Amino acid sequence: MSLSGAHKAAFRREVTQEGQVFAIRDANGFPAPADDEGRRAVPFWSKPTRAQLVVKHVTAYGGFEVVPIPIEEWLGDWMVGLEHDNLLVGINWAGARATGYDLTPGQVLRWFAELEPTAAADERIHSVQR
């Protein structure tokens, strides 16, 4: 498994255990840097310590604060908003350049729906795909 794949697997496991995700923001809001192909992603982490390492070691994110987001809010409002804005979801970015695995909001919802045996997950997927 690649390092990005390992971060992806850890993300789902840890978010499920923690019940929340972690983002970073500064006075300008949440970052959404573009990759080499121009696609933008908002990064999220499964543990505050992962996000804190990026803030501490990646110059571009110096001064950002780590913000917890309850998983229900993240899978609901956040995924709808990211889909609307055509943004990807960065998963446990790490390293000197804060890079990693990116998913579409729909992929994230399907990924977490596998763990959630309720109709609520299906409804969120359908609302994002509309």
Regions found by a protein language model. Give the residues of each.
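Conserved NAD+-utilizing ADP-ribose enzyme module
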Residues: M1-R130
